[in-house]
């Protein structure tokens, strides 16, 4: 025996040595997914990715410190094979010896983690059912007996005393134990999935019964599992009480049980695996039992449901595996014994019996394990002590555990060291029979927690088997939580359902927890308590049912039973969630509160800890920061699963309630015994107090309405969307929980501060969800099913319409009143959530970090979200949902405002309440504005907790105004019903604006609503436009700053623009905006864009009055503006067409019709304009230095716009609050100096630019006033003012654009804005002048100056509506004055530019220099074409001031040159479409104002503007045309349509730009001038044709132009691809290329090719890629991640000799004849400040095929000649057969196709025609079966070659001989034997 033992040891030593060799140096685990670095070191893929993700720049190899990049990592298949073989050997060794190879590793996770994990992974994987499922199935069946026998042997061998146990359990248990952990349990779970589901139903039923009976008899089916859980709980209790004592105690009382289980669990717990171990054991036992019973199924279901959770449980199991091996033997034997016993008592007895057995083996084996565990525990304790994050995490898990008291007990051990009181909790939990159930569910929760703890302790727990890294794991947990929760619910029975809810909460918490573990911990704690309460309530019956409804949907069996109980409540919830729910929820709430109270009394310390954590977080949290962090992750999570993101929100919300929960808990603690409604009432009172404290006016009632509605809506979604069901179920469960908690909002509020807060947080989430549900439900539904979408839409519409009255769309008034109450409550909750978020944010990171990260994340998210939102009808809703989440805090704030307004409006009536609720929805976006307004820029920064409260209060006060607005806006509100998500939001905001503006605007709004009936979107746009125009006027004057600030806060990019502005307050607001999230930002941006557009068009009639009123009602205006912006954004988002509207708005806020048309037409149009908008933003980002934000151009655009508005908002706030001026000295002083004179309206619009422009503004104002006096005679003051307003808004958007788009865009905007304001012309002159004079600052200053100029113009226009037209002329006349003022502004801007980042400055400087150079070239070109334009321009000038026009043309020419240059340089060229459109629209507006009367000849200003616009359009559009002629045309058409008569000349210009406006091209002279300007462009060549079109357009009536606009939009939609590509120049150059290909010559001087350039980069490091990105932005080059037909350049990482590695993009670039150039081309071009000739940097060779084979050059030259004969694969039919590594088959086929071959999908499809030669391409090493490809040639009679033949041929661009690449074929017959050689 000794000898054999020695031999075994020798073998084990060898295996250990091999294992160590194959271990990852980082995680010390066996490398499952090996990746090798350039330095030939091998690591886990997880480890390396985690390492690389930790730093922004290149990371260093842990071993050799060489730089590592993701691109440099290569998968090592050989190494993975070694690992697999080693695992097989180890497995065989274990089977042969009966010893567990990883025993020692079980005790020391770190020492031998890899082997243990390998083995455990196998078992876990099998149990997981994710990987190697087939293997597991194959292995588990044959291995089960051997495993069982080996286990029995192993158990007997391993356990001296265990042998007794083993004897008792060996027969069933040994097998089942190992099998459970091994493949069998997972196998069984998989195999028994059906039976599990049945079992789940039964089990859940049982568990439901057991819930009631849990204490008495936890259902016999569940009894085994529960008994196991209870025993484990007992173990945990004892262990929790005293880990050491427990071990000793366990030995004494139940030596084996406690030592075996308790010790192992305790030891595991420190690692966070204790819960897992226990859960595994319980699961295993239950599995074993289940094998014999339904419990097995249930346990398996647990495994299934936990399988996602198993990812975690496996992780914990890996940590536990050490223990688990022992546990497997010991605990599993225990469980087996229990199985034999079948009864808890029996099981307990068995367990008791087991402990003695386990003692000796356990003790003998556990000593190192115990030591390790104790050390781990200490570390955990230290972590928890040092950082409450762990505590909160643990607490979080513990909270769920508290809910599942057993789980708490299990997890408490982690806390035990930390808190002495935890043991008490544990004891209580353990004592609670339900704890067993809870324990199981909590184990799932705890498992992830354990993983988190381990991660915290060890920094990384690389659990590939866990299926996801933490973040994805969290998401998975959320999704899985939903998916797994279903099985888990079945599994856990009522407890599982509770656990599921807990898990969901945990899951929902997990994403945030992952983001912010501390907060997560806190959030889970309260939510879990809520869940606990809910669970208990569920136990009570209806609450359980309701809470379990979501799970019930998943776990149909339980769902049925639960639904029986829950159906009434659920139906009530779905129907009138408030009323019906309120009563049941009252009991439920009381039950929940009782439970909460009991839980608080049970675990007061934990609650206190949670409270502490939450309190700390609350204090620390800063709303902005939190927003930043949460929205990105949240967005991502949302993208993955709405429920997850919503869960995250809930988590945040829950966290906030945690603070309140402290008080509530205190109250509950006082009333621990009283779990009755009495406790609920005190809790309610406490909640009310808390709510009242946070939002005195916002009684807790309102939120409930939201919640109830939300939950009801989400539930329908669940029912509707099975696919979404899980995620949505999670949402709905959360929502249901929320509903449960909110059903009796008052009770919830009253129920327990904690309960309410938790619920409130849930409710807040709910509210966010309400928006989400309103919109998000639609989104999720739309995501899943059209039916669901419709239902969701109905729900969301109802909810949107009845945001407050959401509870019952049928009961708008009742719902409103209830909702008002509920909303108030909900409002408090949102505030809490906001506070929570703020706290979390503060806790998590510093503002700067958060800003940067959150902005990036949010940009990414918003980028995706905005696209997704706009992509699909649901997407806008999704945007709304995003807005809700982002608004999360603000949404919560918004609910507050809504609540306030709603409550106030309650008196007003249902309509107002509806509006209010719409506002509430809007207030997510709008409230931030209100809050911002209330807070003012500085306060807004404080928007976090206190700010929120203040905002709430101020909102409440302002709510009155809001109410009025709402009342006025009621019609709009109703229209929003038509367009519920958008209009309501926008309407609410608009209502605010309207109230301030006047009833005129309301009338307009009313009309808009009517129009909305016909065109909801358009109406919404109009309504929003009207209100927005009014708001903007008033906002521009007074509230503009606030609204801008709100926009800023709404838009993430506002921060950057604010940074440019240099306003710390704005920055904070920007941060807040970022916090709100990309979607919200996108929506805000859209809303901002849209509102301006709408406002512009609407402001025509009410501009003056609103301005005056706004001045009078500055604060109201601010609120209105804030709300308005948000609503517009929201409406934009809800309405996908708004996307195009956005771009139109972005381009020029004037085109309300355009927006409407866009909305009408076109989702394509919206995409187009959205992209355009993005382009503009991108340009601005380039200029402004928003490069970091450039990731999402649309976000940038919106951000830039929003941020400008945000600045304005700040300014308006500053105006409202003079103290603000001091806060924002540069901007405020600049703005105030002039802006103060101007209406706040101009301030809001011009706030950003106003700073630098204030002086310029004064000059411009003077000149404009002079001009205005002239023009005012021509144009009716009303029209002028209106148009001026529009133009102002256009300028606002323009200024936003200009700041976004950079100087060029500014020029464009200025030019366009000059239509209304000749100021823009001077601005362009100034820009040009500055570009000439101010190389460095000019770009920035130009941007700022342009913005400023625009803004001054806007400001001037605001006070001087009539002057706006004159100001155009005056500005044109005083263009040089403007330049002077611009130079002054530049000096100011220089101060602002100081705010700009160095990178931004450099970029602007570079752009400026390039613009200057290109401008000279363009001027030359323009001069050539000027004769033509001058010919037509004289006619134009003849109509207006010819000198001005001439001047303008000159200015425009230079400006156009600059614009062209800039356009070519930056995405502005793309944006120019939108910009030009905006400008054109503005032009149209200005021309309208100038021509107040259609019959009037366009005033010289408008003409000059048109000329300017043409010039700009010509230059920009030229670039645009080059890039995207259609989009320019579309834009032109849009502008002309919008501006119609007034914009005839503009339309002509636009028409000139695009044929789209041909019907509109009536203004022949304008057209001619425009055409002559555009004559350079091919499209502009038909100047006469365009002129006729333009003339037609000018003659067209407004309605006609509007009709044309839709047509244009349609055309635009048709061309949307091009327009979109242009709009998103960064990402899309296809249309640009295609369009630009036509007109490169126009910008030939500026390198028309630039317009067409679309780059992809390959092999670059992140730093290098950022430089390429900067280069692309600077030169307006599209930079994409994937190569496409539009791609023109492939940037390769090369050495000094231009030799590169071979990559897929490299091959595709060569195959497509692209420019394959070295990265040095970019670096040198940047140094030279121009785009260098690619020939000198073309890649010459690669490391495989030769260093100078010139393949790329050959390929390009052959492509240039477009000679198909020169294609290397011409005449070949190639079939890419079988799997390929490192590239998709379609990419390989595309590569082959690009080289002239005909692609055949299957070898049997070869045509075998003459002149064609078939070839089969395979990759032998990618085939799993060696013989799979050897007979292919026989089937098709074609030569079979390796993929290398294709790659070598493509790389060299020379068809290689097949002989060296042929694969020998196995002849089927002698005759066929020669075929392979063919």
UniProtKB/Swiss-Prot annotation:
Cite the record's Polar residues compositional bias ranges: 303-318, 1138-1148, 1183-1194, 1315-1325, 1377-1401, 1465-1491
As recorded in UniProt, its EC number(s) are 2.3.2.27
Q: Provide ranges: composition bias, Acidic residues.
A: 1344-1369
What PANTHER family does the database record attribute to this sequence?
A: BREAST CANCER TYPE 1 SUSCEPTIBILITY PROTEIN, BREAST CANCER TYPE 1 SUSCEPTIBILITY PROTEIN BRCA1
* Catalytic activity field: S-ubiquitinyl-[E2 ubiquitin-conjugating enzyme]-L-cysteine + [acceptor protein]-L-lysine = [E2 ubiquitin-conjugating enzyme]-L-cysteine + N(6)-ubiquitinyl-[acceptor protein]-L-lysine
Q: Where is the composition biased (Basic residues)?
A: 603-614
Q: Which InterPro entries match?
A: BRCA1 (IPR011364), BRCA1-associated (IPR031099), BRCA1_serine_dom (IPR025994), BRCT_dom (IPR001357), BRCT_dom_sf (IPR036420), Znf_C3HC4_RING-type (IPR018957), Znf_RING (IPR001841), Znf_RING/FYVE/PHD (IPR013083)
* Protein name per Swiss-Prot or TrEMBL: Breast cancer type 1 susceptibility protein homolog
Q: Which domain of life is it from?
A: Eukaryota
Composition-biased stretches, type Low complexity, lie in: 590-601
């Amino acid at each position: 025996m000794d000898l054999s033992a020695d031999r075994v040891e020798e073998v084990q030593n060898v295996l250990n040595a091999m294992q160590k060799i194959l271990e990852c140096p980082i995680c010390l685990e066996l490398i499952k997914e090996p990746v090798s670095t350039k330095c030939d070191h091998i690591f886990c893929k997880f480890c390396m990715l985690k390492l690389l993700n930790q730093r922004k720049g290149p990371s260093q190899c842990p071993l050799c410190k060489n730089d590592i990049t993701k691109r440099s990592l290569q998968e090592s298949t050989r190494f993975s094979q070694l690992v697999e073989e080693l695992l097989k050997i180890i497995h065989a060794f274990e089977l042969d010896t009966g010893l567990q190879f990883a025993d020692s590793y079980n005790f020391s996770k770190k020492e031998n983690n890899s082997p243990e994990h390998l083995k455990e992974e196998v078992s876990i994987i099998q149990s997981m059912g994710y990987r190697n499922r087939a293997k597991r199935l194959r292995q588990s069946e044959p291995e089960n007996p051997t495993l069982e026998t080996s286990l029995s042997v192993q158990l007997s061998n391993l356990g001296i005393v265990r042998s007794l146990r083993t004897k008792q359990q060996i027969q069933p248990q040994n097998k089942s134990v190992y099998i459970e952990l091994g493949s069998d349990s997972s196998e069984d779970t998989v195999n028994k999935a059906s039976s599990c589901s049945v079992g789940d139903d039964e089990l859940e039923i049982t568990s439901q019964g057991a819930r009631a009976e849990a204490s008495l008899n936890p259902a016999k089916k569940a009894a085994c599992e529960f008994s196991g859980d209870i025993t484990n709980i007992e173990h945990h209790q004892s262990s929790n009480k005293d880990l050491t004592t427990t071990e000793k105690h366990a030995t004494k009382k139940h030596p084996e049980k406690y030592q075996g289980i308790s010790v192992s669990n305790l030891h595991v717990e420190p690692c966070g695996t204790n819960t897992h171990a226990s859960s595994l054991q319980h699961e295993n036992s239950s599995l074993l039992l289940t094998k014999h019973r339904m419990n097995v199924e249930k346990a398996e279901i647990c495994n299934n449901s936990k399988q996602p959770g198993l990812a975690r449980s496996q992780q914990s199991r890996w940590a536990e595996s050490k223990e688990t091996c022992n546990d497997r033997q010991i605990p599993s034997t225990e469980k087996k014994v229990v199985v034999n016993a079948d009864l808890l008592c029996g099981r307990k007895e068995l367990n008791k019996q087991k402990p003695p057995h386990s003692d000796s083996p356990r003790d003998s084996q556990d000593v190192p394990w115990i030591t390790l565990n104790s050390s781990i525990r200490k570390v955990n304790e230290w972590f928890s002590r040092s950082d409450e994050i762990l505590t909160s995490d643990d607490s979080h898990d513990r909270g769920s555990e508290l809910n599942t008291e057993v789980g708490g007990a299990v997890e408490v051990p982690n806390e035990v060291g930390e808190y002495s009181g935890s043991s008490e909790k544990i004891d209580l939990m353990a004592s609670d029979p339900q704890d067993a159930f809870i324990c199981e569910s909590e184990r799932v929760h705890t498992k992830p927690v354990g993983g988190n703890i381990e991660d915290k302790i060890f920094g990384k727990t690389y659990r590939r088997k866990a299926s996801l890294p933490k973040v994805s794991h969290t998401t998975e947990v959320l999704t899985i939580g939903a998916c797994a929760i279903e099985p888990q619910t079945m599994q856990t029975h009522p407890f599982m359902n509770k656990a599921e809810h807990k898990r969901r909460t945990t899951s929902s918490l997990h994403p945030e927890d992952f983001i912010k573990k501390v907060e997560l911990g806190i959030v889970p704690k309260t939510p879990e308590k809520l869940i606990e309460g809910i669970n208990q309530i569920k136990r009570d019956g209806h609450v359980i049912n309701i809470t379990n409804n979501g799970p019930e949907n998943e776990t149909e069996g339980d769902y049925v039973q639960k639904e029986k109980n829950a159906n009434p409540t659920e139906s009530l919830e779905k129907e009138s969630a408030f009323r019906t729910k309120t009563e049941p929820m009252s009991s439920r709430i009381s039950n929940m509160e009782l439970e909460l109270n009991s839980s608080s009394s049970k675990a007061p310390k934990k609650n206190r800890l949670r409270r502490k954590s939450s309190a700390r977080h609350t204090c620390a949290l800063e709303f902005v920061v939190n927003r930043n962090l949460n929205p990105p992750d949240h967005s991502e999570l949302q993208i993955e699963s709405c429920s997850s993101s919503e869960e995250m929100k809930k988590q945040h919300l829950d966290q906030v309630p945690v603070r309140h929960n402290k008080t509530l808990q205190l109250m509950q603690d006082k009333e621990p015994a009283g779990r009755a409604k009495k406790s609920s009432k005190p809790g309610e009172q406490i909640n009310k107090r808390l709510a009242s404290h946070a939002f005195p006016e916002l009684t807790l009632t309102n939120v409930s309405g939201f919640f109830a509605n939300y939950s009801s809506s989400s539930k329908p979604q669940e029912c509707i969307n099975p696919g979404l069901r899980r995620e949505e179920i999670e949402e709905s469960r959360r929502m249901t929980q929320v509903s449960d908690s909110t059903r009796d909002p008052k009770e919830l509020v009253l129920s327990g501060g904690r309960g309410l807060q938790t619920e409130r947080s849930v409710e807040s989430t709910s509210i966010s969800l309400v928006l989400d549900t309103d919109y998000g439900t639609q989104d999720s539904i739309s995501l899943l099913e059209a039916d669901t979408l419709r239902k969701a839409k109905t729900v969301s519409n109802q909810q949107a319409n009845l945001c407050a009255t959401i509870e019952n769309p049928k009961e708008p008034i009742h719902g409103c009143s209830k909702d008002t109450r509920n909303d108030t409550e909900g409002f408090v909750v949102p505030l809490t959530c906001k506070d929570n978020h703020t706290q979390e944010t503060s806790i998590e990171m510093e503002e700067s970090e958060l800003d940067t990260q959150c902005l990036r994340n949010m940009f990414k998210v918003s980028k995706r979200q905005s696209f997704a939102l706009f992509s699909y009808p649901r997407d806008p809703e999704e945007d709304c949902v995003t807005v809700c989440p982002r608004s999360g805090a603000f949404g919560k704030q918004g609910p507050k405002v809504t609540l306030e307004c709603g409550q106030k409006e309650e008196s007003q009536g249902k309509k107002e309440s509806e509006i209010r609720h719409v506002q509430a929805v809007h207030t997510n976006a709008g409230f931030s504005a209100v809050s911002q307004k209330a807070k003012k820029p500085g306060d807004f920064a404080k928007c976090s907790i206190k700010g929120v409260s203040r905002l709430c209060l101020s909102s409440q006060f302002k709510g009155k105004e809001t109410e009025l607005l709402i009342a006025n806006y009621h019609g709009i509100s109703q229209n929003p019903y038509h367009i519920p998500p958008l209009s309501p939001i926008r309407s609410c905001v608009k209502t605010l604006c309207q109230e301030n503006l006047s009833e005129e605007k309301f009338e307009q709004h009313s009309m808009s609503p009517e129009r909305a009936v016909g065109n909801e979107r358009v109406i919404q746009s109009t309504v929003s436009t009207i209100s927005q125009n009014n708001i903007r006027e008033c906002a521009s004057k007074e509230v503009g700053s606030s609204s801008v600030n709100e926009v800023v806060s709404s838009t993430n990019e506002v921060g950057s623009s604010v940074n440019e502005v240099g306003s710390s307050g704005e920055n904070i607001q920007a941060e807040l905006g970022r916090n709100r999230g990309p979607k919200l930002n996108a929506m805000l941006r859209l809303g901002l864009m849209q509102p301006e557009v709408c406002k512009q068009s609407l402001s025509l009639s009410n501009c003056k009055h609103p301005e005056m009123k706004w001045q009078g009602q500055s604060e109201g205006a601010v609120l209105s503006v804030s709300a308005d912006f948000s609503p517009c954004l929201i409406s934009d988002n809800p309405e996908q067409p708004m996307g195009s509207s956005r771009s139109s708005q972005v381009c020029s806020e004037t085109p309300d019709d355009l927006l409407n048309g866009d909305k009408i037409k076109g989702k394509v149009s919206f995409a187009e304009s959205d992209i355009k908008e993005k382009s503009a933003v991108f340009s601005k980002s380039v200029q402004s230095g928003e490069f970091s934000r450039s990731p999402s151009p649309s976000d940038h655009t919106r951000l830039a716009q929003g941020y400008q508005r945000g600045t304005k908002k700040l300014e308006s706030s500053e105006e409202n609050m003079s103290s603000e001026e001091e806060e924002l000295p540069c901007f405020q002083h600049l703005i105030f100096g002039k802006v103060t004179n101007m209406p706040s309206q101009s301030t809001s619009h011009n706030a950003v630019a106003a700073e630098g422009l204030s002086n310029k503004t004064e000059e411009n104002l003077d000149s404009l006033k002079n001009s205005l006096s002239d023009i005012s005679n021509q144009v009716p003051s009303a029209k002028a003012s209106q148009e001026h307003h529009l133009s102002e808004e256009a300028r606002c958007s323009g200024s936003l654009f200009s700041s976004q788009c950079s100087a060029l865009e500014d020029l464009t905007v200025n030019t366009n804005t000059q239509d209304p304001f000749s100021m823009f012309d001077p601005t362009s002159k100034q820009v040009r002048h500055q570009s000439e004079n101010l190389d460095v600052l000019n770009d920035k200053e130009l941007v700022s100056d342009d913005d400023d100029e625009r803004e001054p113009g806007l400001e001037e226009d605001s006070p001087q509506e009539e002057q706006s037209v004159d100001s155009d002329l005056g500005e044109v006349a005083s263009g040089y004055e403007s330049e002077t003022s611009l130079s002054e502004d530049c000096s100011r801007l220089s101060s602002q530019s100081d705010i700009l980042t160095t990178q931004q400055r450099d970029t602007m400087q570079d752009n400026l220099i390039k613009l200057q150079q290109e401008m000279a070239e363009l001027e030359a070109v323009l001069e050539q074409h000027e004769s033509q334009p001058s010919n037509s321009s004289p006619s134009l000038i003849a109509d207006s001031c010819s000198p001005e026009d001439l001047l303008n043309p000159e200015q425009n020419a230079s400006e156009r040159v600059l614009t062209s240059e800039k356009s070519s340089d930056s995405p502005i060229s793309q944006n120019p479409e939108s910009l030009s459109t905006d400008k054109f629209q503005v032009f149209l507006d200005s021309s309208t104002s100038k021509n107040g009367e259609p019959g009037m000849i366009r005033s010289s200003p408008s003409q000059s503007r048109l000329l300017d616009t043409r010039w700009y359009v010509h230059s920009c559009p030229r670039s645009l045309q080059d890039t995207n002629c259609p989009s320019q045309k579309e834009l032109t058409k849009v502008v002309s349509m919008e501006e119609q008569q007034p914009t005839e000349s503009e339309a002509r210009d636009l028409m000139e730009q695009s044929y789209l406006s041909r019907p509109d091209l009536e203004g022949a002279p304008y057209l001619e001038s425009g055409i002559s300007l555009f004559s350079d462009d091919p499209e502009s060549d038909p100047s006469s044709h365009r002129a006729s079109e333009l003339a037609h357009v000018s003659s067209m009536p407004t309605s006609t132009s509007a009709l044309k606009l839709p047509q244009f939009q349609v055309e635009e939609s048709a061309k949307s691809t091009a327009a979109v590509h242009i709009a998103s120049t960064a990402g899309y150059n296809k249309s640009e290329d295609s369009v630009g290909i036509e007109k490169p010559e126009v910008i030939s001087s500026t390198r028309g090719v630039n317009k067409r350039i679309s780059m992809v980069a390959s092999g670059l490091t992140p730093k290098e890629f950022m430089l390429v990105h900067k280069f692309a932005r600077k030169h307006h080059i599209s930079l994409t991640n994937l190569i496409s037909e539009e791609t023109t350049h492939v940037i390769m990482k090369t050495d000094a000799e231009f030799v590169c590695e071979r990559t897929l993009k490299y091959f595709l670039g060569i195959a497509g004849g692209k420019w394959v150039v070295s990265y040095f081309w970019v670096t040198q071009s940047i140094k030279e400040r121009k785009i260098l000739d690619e020939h000198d940097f073309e890649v010459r060779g690669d490391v495989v095929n030769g260093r100078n084979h010139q393949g790329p050059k050959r390929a390009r030259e052959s492509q240039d000649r477009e000679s198909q004969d020169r294609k290397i694969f011409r005449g070949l039919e190639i079939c890419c057969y079988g799997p390929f590594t490192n590239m998709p088959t379609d990419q390989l086929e595309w590569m082959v196709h690009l080289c002239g071959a005909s692609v055949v999908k299957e070898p049997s499809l070869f045509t075998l025609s003459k002149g064609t030669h078939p070839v089969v391409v395979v990759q032998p090493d990618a085939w799993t079966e060696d013989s799979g490809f050897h007979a292919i040639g026989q089937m098709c009679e074609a030569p079979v070659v390796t993929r290398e033949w294709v790659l070598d041929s493509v790389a060299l661009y020379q068809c290689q001989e097949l002989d060296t690449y042929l694969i020998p074929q196995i002849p089927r017959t002698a005759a066929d034997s020669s075929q392979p050689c063919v």
